Amino acid sequence: MTDNLHSRMHVVSDETRNLVNLVLDYSRRRTLAVDTPLDHPTTETELKRLAGPTITEDGVGSSRALAIFEHIFAPACITTDHPKYLSFIPSAPTKAAVAFDLVVSASALYGGSWLEGAGVVHAENEVLSWLAGEFGLPESAGGVFVQGGTSGNLSALVAARDARKAQLGDEKPGRWVIVCSAEAHSSVASAAAVMDVDVAPVATGDDGILRPEGVRAALEEHGNAVIAVVATSGTTNFGTIDDIAGIAALKDDYDFWLHIDGAYGLAAMLSPLARHKFAGVESADSVIVDPHKWLFAPFDACALIYRDPDLGRRAHTQRAEYLDTLTESQEWSPSDYAIQLTRRPRGLPLWYSLASYGAETYREAISHSIELAMQIGTEIKKRPNLRLVREPELSVVVFERDDWTREDYQRWSDRLLEDQRAFVVPSSHQGRPNARFAIVNPLTTFEDLVDILDTME
């Protein structure tokens, strides 16, 4: 065995300096690049052929490993921050957020407790408090950054169930129920499955909006079994905003936890163009918003905010002898507020970006996407062979081409990516195939979108 092999990976040596320089050089080039291609996936067989085995007893070396990543693995990944990545909900992290993500890893930070990470917890909490204020929640509101909307929704709904259990005492129903729109995000059903509770989906009208009349009927039907009503502030498929104010008004007659799934759309509250559409959010018991979607942070981050953080803490604090020094303290430990213990301070890139550029820059960037969605919606209506499925509410634009089948949309989508013109995957609504632009990147232009529409002629 080679002398000092046990410490080779951790000492500062010429090898260490070289690999750090390699990684920083690549990161600098990628962050400052202005012509990064969309790229495209390839097959497992092809990746194995090109890369060969990389995990061996002796390793392939840092230079070879980075070369494999840069020239083989990375080109097999679609570039999610490309201005013409318009599928799902894209990610467009700011340059500051991307750069600071390196700092977070380099600093060996733990973001689970105040004891171990007071500085970063303070920074994250400043962002969470600012968001809570933007959403109209009280100064006492607070929460934690988790992995994504699925984790955020699950953590909030677990807290809601815990609060309902404490409220009812021994009078527990046979099955707990979550009330939500039939168009709610799939993560709500996923959370219910993990929690072993039922979902009561409420039908919407043609506009896809969850309204108080349907929620009232569900509350009457299920009574105390309801642990939460989930309203969506910007559905993934259309950007539809439920009637949150009307649903919140039901709290005058019914006692329920109101959770707002704003993973994509709630960020639009920062824009003066859309703020008025979110009336009622201030009455929520919990909300989520994903900074890696429309707040321009890197993957992955979801801000989970409780109206009363103590309810989140009671539901999620983990207890063990070795944790006594943390759990017996009244200091703010983020791991007490979600289904996690070990956590990276994933809110820091957003903090650095907000601190660097200021909130007004964020408002302008979000407004750009909303304006662009309205502009391209108008353009679509001018084209005789295209039709809007719904008027754009935020920055998602859904449209159909006359006489196209699902196969036509798929061929068109495949051709766009093959030609490196755009990444637009087909979608559907009520069994009808369609096309969909999800616009969050401030570098996406009207001309970009018109160019894509022209390929449908």
Locations of regions flagged by a protein language model:
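Conserved PLP-binding catalytic core of the aspartate aminotransferase-like
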Residues: 387-416
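Short Gly/Ser/Thr- and Asp/Glu-enriched loop/turn motifs at secondary-structure junctions
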Residues: 139-140, 389-395, 429-434
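N-terminal entrance/gating region of PLP-dependent enzymes' catalytic architecture
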Residues: 2-140, 422, 435, 444, ...
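Short, glycine-/Ser/Thr-/acidic-enriched flexible segments
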Residues: 183-185, 206-207, 234-236, 265, ...
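PLP-dependent enzyme catalytic core of the Aspartate aminotransferase-like
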Residues: 254, 429-457
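A short linear hydrophobic-aromatic micro-motif
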Residues: 141, 384-388, 421-426
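Conserved PLP-enzyme active-site core in the AAT-like
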Residues: 148, 152-313
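Active-site C-terminal subdomain of aminotransferase-like
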Residues: 279-384
